[in-house]
Amino acid sequence: MTGKKGVFIDLTVTEDETIELLSRGIQLDVLIPDLTAHYKSRNRPAMNRDFPLGSMQGNYTWDELNTRFDELQATYPNIISERIILGESIEERDIWAFKVSDNPNDDEDEPEVLYTALTHAREPVSMMNLFYFVQLLAEEYGNDPELTYLVNNREMWFVPVINPDGYVYNESIQPDGGGMHRKNRRDTNCGDGTNRGVDLNRNYGYGWGANDTGSSPDPCATTYRGESEFTEPETQAVRDFMLSHEFKDVLH
């Protein structure tokens, strides 16, 4: 897209946004016409790598993630706690967390850290990175001095999927991976497709609605912030969990 002569801007836009830009007389050159197909093609080589992957272009499906966590927890119960339920999503799926520490079932006087992932449903790599980090901690505990120190001197909490409904929706429309739905699945009168929902990352209380640049009041926009702060059960669950702990750091 050209802003002024000699200046070009690369943007990721929806079909509706493309139509809007064209209606304003803005010149567009489409570099990647189908992001879903692009990501599926780009991710395919990873299938040959020598570590356990999921069936959705290497990413775990919702069911696979739950199964894989149960397997890891059963193998390493000495440092991985059982899951705790923080709340339910719009479509009544569990939002859950677990702790990695040397005494995972005890509340020790150690600094707490929170890791979260998949606030945006189309960003599965965030969940996969967390999951493999946990797997690394478990497998190297007692062998790697730095990782062992972390486990022994921190209480590390993980919420692998904040937005389960959006993630399952992407799985339903693109079972081979590459689904581009971003928001949760609240009915915002925008149809049943990817325009539906609230952007959970814009629904938290801090700075909510400060402007219409970083978030949108339009229910069909990808950055729709909701009718007010913390309207969504997913953000409420994260808020309440954080208020019940004293996290020193949060990696969101």
Say what each PLM segment does:
Residues 1-252:
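M14 metallocarboxypeptidase catalytic domain recognition
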